Amino acid sequence: MSLEMFDKEIFDLTNKELERQCEGLEMIASENFTLPEVMEVIGSILTNKYAEGYPGKRYYGGCEFVDEIETLAIERCKKLFNCKFANVQPNSGSQANQGVYAALINPGDKILGMDLSHGGHLTHGAKVSSSGKMYESCFYGVELDGRIDYEKVREIAKKEKPKLIVCGASAYARVIDFAKFREIADEIGAYLFADIAHIAGLVVAGEHPSPFPHAHVVSSTTHKTLRGPRGGIIMTNDEELAKKINSAIFPGIQGGPLMHVIAAKAVGFKFNLSDEWKVYAKQVRTNAQVLANVLMDRKFKLVSDGTDNHLVLMSFLDREFSGKDADLALGNAGITANKNTVPGEIRSPFITSGLRLGTPALTARGFKEKEMEIVSNYIADILDDINNEKLQENIKQELKKLASNFIIYERAMF
């Protein structure tokens, strides 16, 4: 029996989501379009197999084939990131980070991470997260120019003396200097942990410096700029840390791994290792630079005055409207983005004075400089006349026509 016959409600909603993804423009920086091959294996019989433990050391029988699958995923991950050890079992980036903390430090120890309101992530010590409840957290941020001042990070680190420093961000448009972070960590005897969830796809293509050999441990998601399935990974070059990480993930915080997702990670890594991937990642950055340049030419303020990676962060501190207003206006025109706090923030985190835009998903559809220039100017048009609902509807129809030339999926399920 087909899904349509068995559960028409879910079938219909999934197809409505397909329509939304195909007809609108996805510009949330953390979202992307994965491969049909990735979705195909996620929907496979591998979902049936329990495989607690690691390849060759399982608690259940019948794991000979999933052992080979996980080993493939591990080897491809190691080759991709040029590292010696990899754990591909974390179910998410947050769980990967939780596993790193559990492996490297003890509850109550101090961690130093980027402030959430400055572009960090919940799992980097935010008080509302378990990372901010289980561990004592302190923070560094960006200056009013939107950039990290590494001397200030050094001052904070020397004063606070954390056991672990987290570098990585969810809304930082500039290159992260991993070598500088390692210098600071070494000065105080701390671990350096790099969370590259947002930039991993650029890192493996040589479009952003690698955290290796500087970081003791590196984590990432496998979606975002990697375009794989939703999930997490942890990597290191230190064998002793690798053993601790493996124990922290299983049996520490997870039970049976999701073998259908691990297989999908392996498929994604195969794509990331191809020459085609390097072309894609380069275009992601090029498209982001086009977006940044058009918006600045149209007199909009960007945090750090540009971008080095896949995202731009707009600041509306000099405007009467908020990030939430901009988010809603673009949404009315078929462009999905997200409101975001900015340096010098004057509004609440639920309103914000910024907007985060990313190019990975549009690039996955085949958008290049020409299309990005069109889209960027439409964004500026909308924000220049933010209450003009008729304009938003007209642009929505124009973008729908543009999107129809770049259909990413012909069907909702694979």
From Swiss-Prot:
User: Which InterPro entries does the record match to this protein?
Assistant: PyrdxlP-dep_Trfase, PyrdxlP-dep_Trfase_major, PyrdxlP-dep_Trfase_small, Ser_HO-MeTrfase, Ser_HO-MeTrfase-like, Ser_HO-MeTrfase_PLP_BS, SHMT-like_dom
GO MF, one annotated term: pyridoxal phosphate binding
> Top EC class per UniProt?
transferase
Domain of life from the UniProt record:
Bacteria
* GO biological process per UniProt: glycine biosynthetic process from serine; tetrahydrofolate interconversion
Functional pathway: One-carbon metabolism; tetrahydrofolate interconversion; Amino-acid biosynthesis; glycine biosynthesis; glycine from L-serine: step 1/1
Q: Recorded E.C. number(s)? A: 2.1.2.1
Location of N6-(pyridoxal phosphate)lysine modifications:
224
Binding residues annotated for (6S)-5,6,7,8-tetrahydrofolate, in chain numbering: 116, 120-122, 240, 348-350
Q: Where in the cell is it found?
A: Cytoplasm
| Reaction it catalyzes | (6R)-5,10-methylene-5,6,7,8-tetrahydrofolate + glycine + H2O = (6S)-5,6,7,8-tetrahydrofolate + L-serine
Keywords attached to this entry = Amino-acid biosynthesis, Cytoplasm, One-carbon metabolism, Pyridoxal phosphate, Transferase
Keyword Amino-acid biosynthesis assigned = yes
CDD domains the UniProt entry points to: SHMT
Marked site (Plays an important role in substrate specificity) residue numbers: 223
GO cellular component term of the entry, any? cytosol
What PANTHER family does the annotation carry? SERINE HYDROXYMETHYLTRANSFERASE (PTHR11680:SF50)
Do you know which HAMAP family this protein is assigned to? SHMT
Q: So what does this one do?
A: Catalyzes the reversible interconversion of serine and glycine with tetrahydrofolate (THF) serving as the one-carbon carrier. This reaction serves as the major source of one-carbon groups required for the biosynthesis of purines, thymidylate, methionine, and other important biomolecules. Also exhibits THF-independent aldolase activity toward beta-hydroxyamino acids, producing glycine and aldehydes, via a retro-aldol mechanism.
Q: Which family does it belong to?
A: Belongs to the SHMT family.
Q: How is the subunit organization of this protein annotated in UniProt?
A: Homodimer.
Q: What is this protein called?
A: Serine hydroxymethyltransferase
- Name of encoding gene: glyA
